[in-house]
Amino acid sequence: MPDAPQDRRKWSVLSGLFLVYMASNGITLHTLPLLYPELIETFGWRASEVTLPATIFFIVGALTSPPAGWLLDRYSSRLIIALGGLLLCIGLVAYGMTQTLWQLVAVYALLGLALSLCGLVSNMVMLTSWFATGRGRATGILLMASSLGGALFPFIVGTGLEQSGWRTTVMLAGIGVGIVILGSAWLLLRDGRLASQKVALPPSLSPRGVGSLNAALKERRFYAIIFITGSLWFIIIALTQHQSIHLARDIGLSKTLLPAVFSLFFGSSVIGKLGFGLLSDRFDLHKVMAVSILLLAVALLLLAQLSALDRALLYLYAVMAGIGFSGTFTCIQLLVASHYSGSHYGRILAIVVLIDTLCGALG
């Protein structure tokens, strides 16, 4: 009975993290590209100029992840998430006031910094501090938020573009995102380090890597993890960024069918995130991760055999690729947490995210 309030609190924290991750990822990664045609029409910029700020966004986000990880290990993750949410709100409001390309580049740099403070690393640090057991299920639920944000925010912003124009829409979206993240930080999020320290874990559930960052950097295991996750991230980003071009241009798939394939792909990704999170709680994580990688590999083989006329094979690819990609992504987060959920977890995870992001950029 004494543990009941603690259990309720950790699920309340998870609900707050879900809202934060949905808002931060939903707007920055899945929605802002909708504004590219509006920017081209308003300013007469070339496509290469419009996408330049997004490149800066990913570079800044990657480079600021290690400092953010250091802050998360030393200070309140709740406070850092709130700071990231505030910067995200300011950046989106400034986006709506943009007049020149260099201003847009500066805005995207600010958004990259904001996401490094309130994005995946900070969410996983807080989640890991609360969920010593059932971490796979909790991680799967958290990562589902990105898929929900990817479905929700483009619809909302797309409606706003038609009714109010891009400037008003992006500023209102910024205010809304700020309210969601800051409200969640105030009402739902709580730092969990002290709470988790009160729980005496059995040896089988104790973190296997609680050393310092310096100790991790001397381990072959750490570099093996980076090689595995970096390689997988290269494949995942290459798949998600280029599959639409391949299906339409190389396979000859009708553009009217692309939305259905993508809906099936991302719908299956929700199943993959939760499903592989649950499986990792019941079975050996490394074996579960191997299954997710195998599914992804089979999906890639199917992709090489696709034709525009074989609808069944096309939909099978979408399901297997969605489940395989999302399951692998979930297992990557759990792999790092299972080995390094100690006092330097934030720093170690941030370095892994930095390497993975750079590998993804190559993809």
Identify the meaning behind each predicted range:
Residues A145-R193:
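Helix-loop-helix hairpin linking two adjacent transmembrane segments in secondary transporters
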Residues T28-L39, N214-F276, G363:
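Extracytoplasmic gate region of multi-pass secondary transporters
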